[in-house]
From Swiss-Prot:
This is Histone-lysine N-methyltransferase, H3 lysine-79 specific. Histone methyltransferase that specifically trimethylates histone H3 to form H3K79me3. This methylation is required for telomere silencing and for the pachytene checkpoint during the meiotic cell cycle by allowing the recruitment of RAD9 to double strand breaks. Nucleosomes are preferred as substrate compared to free histone. It is found in: Nucleus. Its EC number is 2.1.1.360. Residues 1-19 have a biased composition (Polar residues). Signal peptide: none annotated. GO terms for molecular function: histone binding; histone H3K79 trimethyltransferase activity. It is an enzyme of class 2 (transferase). The lineage of its organism: Eukaryota, Fungi, Dikarya, Ascomycota, Saccharomycotina. The gene is DOT1.
Length: 572
């Protein structure tokens, strides 16, 4: 999907809207004087409700605020909410009404003023609204930056609250000071002793895999302008980029990827004696990125190449042997890089399916998967299964982030299966490049999970199983019911629709049915959790297999046979 196509579509709809609004204004002005012809309105002019729906859909451009190519497969932008002065005044009035007079007197006695600052130092890159780069940075960093700026620049606060807020801001500043390209570095992967492959790291010539080059995003005449970036574990390996702030093919921008790669190396791989120099480079790199200064950015990358060549390898190995904390954002960066190389050039093939069928393609976002996998207690002793694994995103994330003993996926579509193979190959190469141990991953591709011998073999051992049944029809849901019958007690099922049908009642002729032993919990689906919309599309469900029958299926409200009794209120 090209950027030009998106912008041209937006301009067409905006022109249609302007013409339609002009017509509506003319009609409103002449409504009292001019009679309306019966055949003039129907079929020739869009109604206001139709136009509102089209305008609403055009708010959600798919790539404009993200540095990596964001097609229908990845996050979508929330519409910007502009707060007017009247809304701010109204909010101030409401907040004043809530405070009692006694509290106001106490606050005035112990109050102090805090000077407003232009831009807090702890605001991440990308928080400036006027910067050209803003559209290419993550919306999350913008929101978090605004919240921190507001907390520091408030007017009068009590002396106790002021000291607390200052301490909190200092804490945030210290924790975020070293995080510019990566986000939320405080959240770490579950510790496991075998995350880094020290045997591979000890040998500088052990990397022999081939990486997918970023040349695919560059025009032929620009290939000669590519510059190499070295990797800290294998300085002899260079990945070539076109260091340019303009968006390339498929909406790709290499600068944030380079920044994340360098910051990850400084954060995890640099020995303590070299960290200060590395952090200075990252800050300079971020400044050049915000200014869209390509020449300065290129010079800093070359300085980084020279710096990592001077670091003794034994210090790097010693640092990684101490099992440093690995941020989740580093894992997501690695997954995103593999996704970009393997999926984006072929993404259009995933659109070839029958609408509203069992073969409709959709993805679950990495942030959402991190949350739900933690809720299920996924760990290095778990076996994970994904029935309908698509391009393999959930399978490889469960393996890399949580270190599952085995991660298994089953996919029937040919195009998605091809891309799953490409993505797994790229992931293995990049894990070796970063010296990471990748636990076992297995796929059953171009096959259905129905009557699948490998699925039948793994089901009794499975600890967590993911079934994206958002649009499954009744016959396929019946097949899912048959597949999960062999799950052991304690295993968990993640789904977007409840595996057990609403209003399910126990069948005394089929007491062994696993639906009788499912404890189903529903959770609110966060925004930006699925690929087809940024909005929350309802709930997701985690069903736990119990040893005994779930007592909730005996509850009349669950059976749906007794309506909720509401008290009758009499009014005059």
């Amino acid at each position: 999907m090209s950027t030009e196509a998106t912008s041209s579509d937006a301009s067409v709809f905006s022109n249609m809207h302007s013409v339609d609004s002009t017509r509506d204004n003319t009609r409103d002005n002449t409504r009292d004087n001019t009679p309306m012809n019966e055949g003039d309105t129907q079929g020739k002019r869009m109604t206001k409700s139709t136009m509102a729906l089209i305008e609403e859909s055009m708010k959600y451009d798919m790539r404009s605020e993200y540095f990596l190519p964001m097609t229908f497969l990845r996050e979508r932008r929330k519409p910007a909410r502009v707060e007017s002065d009247e809304e701010d005044k109204l909010a101030e009035v409401k907040s004043k009404r809530r405070v009692s007079k006694k509290d106001q007197v106490k606050a005035d006695i112990h109050s102090t003023k805090i000077k407003k600052t232009g831009r807090p130092s702890n605001v991440k890159a990308g928080a400036k609204n006027t910067s050209k780069v803003t559209k290419q940075r993550s919306t999350k960093s913008q929101v978090s930056g605004k919240k921190r700026a507001r907390s520091i620049s408030d007017g009068k606060v009590s002396s106790i609250d002021a000291s607390r807020s200052l301490k909190a801001s200092k804490k945030k500043h210290s924790s975020h000071a070293d995080s510019l390209f990566l986000s939320n570095i405080e959240e770490n992967v579950n510790p496991r002793p075998s995350f880094f492959n020290t045997t591979l790291i000890a040998n500088p010539s052990s990397f022999t895999n081939k990486l997918t080059s970023s040349k695919m995003f560059v025009d032929d005449e620009e290939v000669t302008s590519l510059k190499g970036m070295k990797y800290i574990l294998f300085p002899g390996v260079e990945e070539e980029y076109l260091i340019c702030s303009k968006v390339q093919k498929f909406g790709y921008n290499p600068l944030p990827e380079i920044g994340q790669s360098i910051e990850s190396a400084v954060l995890l791989y640099f020995p303590n004696t070299y960290k200060t120099k590395g952090q200075e480079l990252v800050r300079s790199l971020n400044d050049a990125f915000e200014r869209s200064d390509d020449q300065s950015f290129e010079k800093i990358v070359l300085k980084y190449n020279d710096l990592i060549s001077t670091i003794p390898r034994d210090l790097i190995v010693k640092n990684l042997s101490s099992n440093p904390d690995v941020p989740v954002s580093f894992v997501h960066f690695l997954l995103h890089t593999c996704y970009t190389r393997a999926i984006y050039p072929h993404a259009r093939k995933l659109k070839k399916y029958t609408s509203f069928s069992n073969f409709v393609y959709g993805e679950l976002m990495p942030d959402f998967l991190t949350i739900v996998f933690k809720k299920c207690g996924l760990n290095s002793n778990s076996i994970f299964m994904d029935l309908g694994s698509g391009v393999g995103n959930c399978v490889i994330q469960a393996s890399l982030e949580f270190g599952c003993k085995l991660s298994f996926g089953c996919e029937i579509m040919d195009s998605a299966s091809d891309m799953a193979e490409l993505q797994l190959k790229e992931l293995k190469s990049r894990c070796d490049l970063w010296g990471i141990n990748l636990p076992p991953i297995d796929f059953s591709l171009r096959k259905s999970f129905v009557d699948n011998e490998r699925v039948r073999e793994l089901i009794p051992q499975c600890d967590v199983i993911l079934i994206n049944n958002f649009i499954f029809d009744a016959p396929l849901n019946k097949e899912v019911e048959k597949v999960v019958q062999g799950l052991k007690a304690g295993s968990k099922i993640i789904s977007l629709k409840s595996i057990r049908p609403p209003g399910y009642s126990i069948n005394y002729d089929d007491m062994d049915n696993i639906f009788n032993r499912l404890h189903v919990e529903s959770f609110k689906l966060p925004e930006n959790s699925v690929s087809w919309t940024y909005r929350s599309v309802g709930d997701y469900y985690i069903s736990t297999v119990l040893d005994a029958i779930d007592e909730s299926i005996f509850c009349p409200p669950i059976l749906g046979r007794i309506r909720k009794k509401e008290s009758i209120k009499y009014t005059r």
